Amino acid sequence: MKADTKNSILIIGGGLIGLSIAYEFARNDYTVEVLSKNRNESAGFVAAGMLATHAEGLEDELLVFGQQSQSLIPEWIKNIEYDSGIDCGLKKCGIVVPFKNLKRLKEFPTYKYGKYLNHKNLKKEINGINPSWEHGLLFEQDGQIDNRRRLMRALERACSLHRVKFQEGSDVKELIVEKNKILGAKVLNATGEMRNIFCEKVILCCGSWSKKVLNNLPIFPVKGQ
């Protein structure tokens, strides 16, 4: 490893995950550079921001992982809001899941974590719901965050204040590999210049487009996700 790459992080992808990782490394005194083609096209600007570990009906290890992750969010958001000065819109407002019969309700993987709603109380939570939905579960521990208008902008500002370097319009052509170790990336920048960026660690955060960098990854875009 080159001496000048110590504690340097190259993040490929400037969406919600890329910015979140950049923020954590930067606030712990790493040198961080974020590459993105067009950050405004990231999923974080269109995703609903649901924190729905229980309402999504997760099971087994994934449920435990989701619960642990969800428990960390308030403190994490508190740090981002403090550094950025932007309210991220975190709300523990609860999420309602309706059911047409009790059998379906009791088969729902996380039903034991929810508060039962009869039809009368379900209508109070979801005004105008079709009468065929007779039962519901209110997961009071779930909630939402304002990704599009607040969290993404807050992360951008917090990262900038921690001296994260952003390279917009960057197209990663390939990773630089030597002796089975990733040393950096070959990048075509917005001005058409090809450059090599060396670093201690490369973190791939391209979401659905990760296969463009590593074509053996079993990742593909899904409508609505």
Regions found by a protein language model. Give the residues of each.
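N-terminal Rossmann-like FAD-binding beta1-loop-alpha1 element of flavoenzymes
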Residues: 7-33
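Conserved Rossmann-like nucleotide-cofactor binding loop
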Residues: 17, 40, 209
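Short loop/edge segments at beta-strand edges and connector loops
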Residues: 36, 118-119, 152, 168-170, ...
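Central helical "cap/lid" subdomain
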Residues: 189-225
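A conserved short coil-to-beta-strand element within the FAD-binding core of flavoproteins
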Residues: 166-183
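Glycine-rich FAD pyrophosphate-binding loop
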Residues: 26-46
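Dinucleotide-binding Rossmann-like beta1-alpha1 core, especially the glycine-rich loop
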Residues: 49-128, 134
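Short beta-strand to alpha-helix junction loop
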Residues: 64-67, 102-103, 138-157
